[in-house]
């Protein structure tokens, strides 16, 4: 899908609602599926990722009935016999959350996926499974696991994706004995770990930090059904937030002020860049401001990386983004992808491992003659849309359908802000 994105002749400004948090929705769906009884999850966006988790839940242990923006999940209290692989589409969260849960089913479980999903590293789980003499077979065609995890002590690196830690958090409390997760410092993305724990607590399963690097997971617990409302998503709100910080006149609604979402850091980052905004309840309104580059640590908020690279181009001075290594292992190599596309627009930036240096150069940005590549990556496409609107460039972008992965309504929702999108 090839589209051209440009700002409206009337300028940028308006109100946009943050879509439901994809991270929280994944967690709520799985907790509901593992419960015995009916849970009602409200404020859902049926992106490809969330649809993959809902389908997997229905295949494994739940009856799922979806509405326009909600889902009733009836946990069956037992696992169903599998007759086909579990298709995780391109969702890393779906796959990594479900691998430990699969160990509870008493049967071999094969996972399949699309895009780069089966190329993404799973060595954390592979090591744990091999240590317990369990089956773990990964190939480009799929991943098969078999055998039951045992309660006990688990040691794993704290600077890997928190999805591995969350996957163990889902499954281990259901085992008959206590378990401890010993995280080798540094512990990154702690906010995502605590988000998992908070959603679990809403469904009656509890864990606690014994110290800064050790989690106690009491065994013999049971998930209980509940009604759960999903918060607005700060990682997605980052796109209109950067647009608002540059252009002004943008209000984002649905952003809980007391959130556990690590990507809420976008507001602090923008404030440090000189952004001017006010908060009233769950709404944040931006005024136009002169922005300057800052030093940014992505360790706890890696999903912000692509749009922060765009922000850096539109700030005065230099922006340095550190601890961005994990961007190379997403739906695309996001560092390489964004470097290529931003340079095509006249951007000046370079990377060294996990450090990205972006030089403010708004005055030299231009629309290239050839289309930009979306790299089949939703965050790359949405970041390029922000660049087009904020810099006043008509940019043609391919792979625009990649937004279906996380925010299917992104282009339609951004239209009232003055972001025009047409088929190219």
What do these predicted regions represent?
Residues 1-424:
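Short, structured segments at the rim of ligand-binding sites
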């Amino acid at each position: 899908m090839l589209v051209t994105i440009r700002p409206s002749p009337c300028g940028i400004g308006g109100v946009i609602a943050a879509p439901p948090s994809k991270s929280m929705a994944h967690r709520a769906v799985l907790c509901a599926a593992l419960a015995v009884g009916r849970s009602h999850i409200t404020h859902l966006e049926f992106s490809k990722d969330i649809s993959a988790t809902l389908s997997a839940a229905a295949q494994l242990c739940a009856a799922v009935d979806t509405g326009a923006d909600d889902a009733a999940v009836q946990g069956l209290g037992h696992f169903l016999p599998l007759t086909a692989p579990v298709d995780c589409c391109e969702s890393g969260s779906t796959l990594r959350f479900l691998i430990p849960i699969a160990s509870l089913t008493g049967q071999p479980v094969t996972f399949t996926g699309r895009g780069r999903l089966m190329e993404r590293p799973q060595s954390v789980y592979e090591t744990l499974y091999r240590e317990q003499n369990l089956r773990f077979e990964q190939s480009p065609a799929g991943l098969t696991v078999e055998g039951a995890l045992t309660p006990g002590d688990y040691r794993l690196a704290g600077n890997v994706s928190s999805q591995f830690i969350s996957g163990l958090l889902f499954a281990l409390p259901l085992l008959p004995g206590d378990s401890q997760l010993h995280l080798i410092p540094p512990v990154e993305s702690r906010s995502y770990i605590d988000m998992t724990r908070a959603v679990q607590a809403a469904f009656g399963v509890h864990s606690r930090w014994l110290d800064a690097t050790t989690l106690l997971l009491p065994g013999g617990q049971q998930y209980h059904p509940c009604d759960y409302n999903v918060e607005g998503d700060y990682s997605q709100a980052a796109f209109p937030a950067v647009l608002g910080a540059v252009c002004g006149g943008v209000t984002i609604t649905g952003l809980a002020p007391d959130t556990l979402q690590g990507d809420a850091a976008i507001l602090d980052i923008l404030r440090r860049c000189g952004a001017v905004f006010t908060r009233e309840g769950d709404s944040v309104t931006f005024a136009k401001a002169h922005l300057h580059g800052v030093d940014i640590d992505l360790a706890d908020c890696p999903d912000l990386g692509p749009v922060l690279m765009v922000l850096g181009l539109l700030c005065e001075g230099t922006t340095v983004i550190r601890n961005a290594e994990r961007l190379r292992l997403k739906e695309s190599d996001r560092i390489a992808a964004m470097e290529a596309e931003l340079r095509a627009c006249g951007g000046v930036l370079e990377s060294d491992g996990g450090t990205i240096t972006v030089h403010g150069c708004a005055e030299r940005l231009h629309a290239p003659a050839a289309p930009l590549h979306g790299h089949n990556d939703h965050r790359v496409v949405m970041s390029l849309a922000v660049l087009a609107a904020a810099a006043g460039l008509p940019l043609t972008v391919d792979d625009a359908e990649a937004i279906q992965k996380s925010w299917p309504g992104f282009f339609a929702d951004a239209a009232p802000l003055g972001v025009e999108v047409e088929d190219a």
